[in-house]
Amino acid sequence: MTDPDSDADRPTMAPFVGALAIIALVVIAIVLFNVFGDDEPPAGQQVGRAAVGQNDALQRQNFADFRTYTCRAQQGVEADVLARQRDSVAKRGERFVDDVTDIKVDGDRATAKVTYHFDKAPDAKTGVGMTFVREDGAWKVCSTGPS
């Protein structure tokens, strides 16, 4: 005969199988989100990156990077762009982007207020209305900032 108490003491695997199923569902959900989720940042964030990237390229006098963040209509000639940048640095110091606000996106065009300051007058903030366009799949600055 079997002892009735021995069957009651035997552990069951149901809680472990249930926990394993929940963990598997969570892992599957994470994988699906990573595969099908949107990796591209919002357009407003891309506009801000374009403003900062263009300014950084100018400060480093890197015309190739400047072109990456500038629309074709505003790219100009390398010698002229870099000469204006050197002149601006000599007069006002390096230019820094403090903020990009009031971003408004309308299809492949956008506007934003970009706030700058210069090294020689760090407390004098200059807010400039800038325009941006989406060219070749990327947002690019399509107006000139203060120099």
Predicted segments — roles?
Residues T2-Q59:
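Short, low-complexity N-terminal intrinsically disordered segments enriched in polar/charged residues
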Residues T70-R72, V141-G145:
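Sequence contexts marking disulfide-bonded cysteines in secreted/extracellular proteins
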